[in-house]
Amino acid sequence: MLRLVVGALLLVLAFAGGYAVAACKTVTLTVDGTAMRVTTMKSRVIDIVEENGFSVDDRDDLYPAAGVQVHDADTIVLRRSRPLQISLDGHDAKQVWTTASTVDEALAQLAMTDTAPAAASRASRVPLSGMALPVVSAKTVQLNDGGLVRTVHLPAPNVAGLLSAAGVPLLQSDHVVPAATAPIVEGMQIQVTRNRIKKVTERLPLPPNARRVEDPEMNMSREVVEDPGVPGTQDVTFAVAEVNGVETGRLPVANVVVTPAHEAVVRVGTKPGTEVPPVIDGSIWDAIAGCEAGGNWAINTGNGYYGGVQFDQGTWEANGGLRYAPRADLATREEQIAVAEVTRLRQGWGAWPVCAARAGAR
C-alpha cells in the first residue's frame, strides 16, 4: 500500500512541475519604444504589464489588447499617453493627449504635419509629464538663393529653419537677409548669399630659378640671359573664394613639385661708373619717346638723331652719355633717361619743345 501511495505522489509532483514549466514564458515588453525581455507566469497582457510596474490608462495604446492571452516569445507594446499644450502661431494653447515619444511623431499623430515646432526640435523627446508645444503654420515666402528665385510654402519658426526645410540650409560663411533668427511672416522676401572657400589643385609651370653672374665689363643697368633654363611643373593648391558660385579671388596655399626646373643663368653688369639713378617721371619720358621716336628707344634712322628722345651726338656726349654707350640708341631706356634728366636740368623741357608740351611736361 505504501508503495502505491508514494507512486501516486510522484506522479502528481511530476505533473505539477511540467505544468509550471509549460506556464512559464519569456516575452518582449516594449514601453514607449524601450524594449525589455521579461519572464512571467502570467497569461494575460494586462497582468504582465502591471506585474512589471506599469499601469495602463484609458488614453494609452496597448497591443495586444489587455485581455489577450500571451504565449512564449510574444511581444507586448505599451505607448503611454502624455499631455501637450499646443498653441498655433501664438494663439491660445489647448491641451491634447498623445502617445508619441517625439515632437515629430506627435505632430504626425495629431495630423499637424503642415506645422513646425517654434522652439523644440522635431527630434525632441516628449516627457511623460507632458510639455508646452508652440507651433507655427506654413507661410508663403519668396526665396532668392544665390540668384535662383523661387516661391516656397513651408512651416518654419525662423529664416534658418525655413532654409533647412527647403533643403538649402545655411553653410560655412553664408549670409542671409533677414537674419537667420528672424521669424517667418507671410510674404517675406529672403536673400541668401552663398560664400564658399574651396580648395582647387592645378598643374602649372614651375619657373626656373635664376643664377646671376656678375660681369665687370658690362654696364650696371644691363642684363643678358645666358641660359633661359627649362621650366618644370608643379601642382599648386589654391584656396578659392566664391560668391554664389562665381570666383572672387584665390590664394596659393600649397605646392608639390612634379618636374624640377633647370636653373637659368643671367649675366648682370657691374662695370664701375655706369650706375643709373632711379627713373623719375618715367611716364612722361615714355610719352616723349612715343612722340619723338614712336616709343622705340633703340631707333637709328641715320638722320643724326638717336634713341627714344632723339639725342644728337653732341648733346649725348656733352651730358655724360659716353659713360653708358657710344651713341644714345645703344644705351638702355634707363641710361637714356639718366642722360635726358641731366639735359633737362641744363636746358629745361625746351630741349624737346613740341613733344614735351604734348606729354604735359612743365
Swiss-Prot record:
Keyword Cell membrane appears in the UniProt entry: yes
Keyword Disulfide bond in annotation: yes
Induction trigger: Expressed in actively growing cells.
Lipid moiety-binding region (S-diacylglycerol cysteine): C24
Main location: membrane
Phenotype reported upon loss of the gene: Not essential, disruption of rpfB alone has no effect on growth or survival in liquid culture, nor in mouse infection models, colonies plated over a 52-week culture period are visibly drier and more friable. Alterations in gene expression are seen. All 5 genes in this family can be deleted without affecting growth in culture, however triple deletion mutants (rpfA-rpfC-rpfB or rpfA-rpfC-rpfD) are not able to resuscitate spontaneously in the presence or absence of O(2), and are attenuated in a mouse infection model.
Membrane topology: Lipid-anchor
Biotechnology: A promising vaccine candidate, an rpfB-encoding DNA vaccine induces elevated cellular immune responses, confers modest but significant protection against intra-tracheal tuberculosis challenge in female C57BL/6 and BALB/c mice.
Disulfide bond sites: C291-C355
Keywords in alphabetical order: Cell membrane, Disulfide bond, Hydrolase, Lipoprotein, Membrane, Palmitate, Signal, Virulence
Localization annotation: Cell membrane
CDD domains associated with the record: RPF (cd13925)
EC number(s) given by UniProt: 3.-.-.-
Domain remarks in the Swiss-Prot or TrEMBL record: An expressed fragment (residues 194-362) hydrolyzes an artificial lysozyme substrate 4-methylumbelliferyl-beta-D-N,N',N''-triacetylchitotrioside (MUF tri-NAG).
Family: Belongs to the transglycosylase family. Rpf subfamily.
PANTHER family with a match to the protein in the record: CELL WALL-BINDING PROTEIN YOCH, RESUSCITATION-PROMOTING FACTOR RPFB
UniProt protein name: Resuscitation-promoting factor RpfB
Gene transcribed to yield this protein: rpfB
